[in-house]
Structures are given as C-alpha cells and as structure tokens.
C-alpha cells in the first residue's frame, strides 16, 4: 500500500515517495513533504537546468547549485528555467 503526503509543491494529498531521494535532512524533508508527481516535475526541471547551464555533476559547485534550486523549487519561491530556454513545440 502506498503512502500519501500533503505535497508542499502541489498543495494536496498525493502518493508519497518510496524512499528519501536525497541524503541528509533535505532528503528527509523531501520524503515527508513531496509527492511522486512533484518529484517527477523536479526531475524534468533539473534536466533543463543541467542541459541549459551545461552542468557537470562531478563538479561540487554544480551539485550545490542544483541543491539550492531544488530547495527553491519545493520550499521557496520556485526555480525558474534559464532565460534562454524555450520549451519544445508540442
């Protein structure tokens, strides 16, 4: 049976994550307050950030940037795509 959480991003009850997706306190907070649907939204947004900013994930500064953007995405004012980003046409 899946667990439900009140998703901080979607502001409604939804299926919770199966395990903490990130280490430490941030991972615990994500596990307790973020739904699977919202996590998938973050994964898509994170891919945009990695591609548009050409981030290398072995670089500690890139990982720190993504962590800050993740906190903003879920718990802050929101993370916005780079200005140069144009979504693919449907």
From Swiss-Prot:
Any one GO molecular function term: iron ion binding
Keywords for the protein's UniProt record, in alphabetical order: Iron
Function noted in UniProt: Could be a mediator in iron transactions between iron acquisition and iron-requiring processes, such as synthesis and/or repair of Fe-S clusters in biosynthetic enzymes.
A Pfam family reported for this protein in Swiss-Prot or TrEMBL: Iron_traffic
Family classification: Belongs to the Fe(2+)-trafficking protein family.
Gene Ontology biological process: cellular response to oxidative stress
Protein name: Probable Fe(2+)-trafficking protein
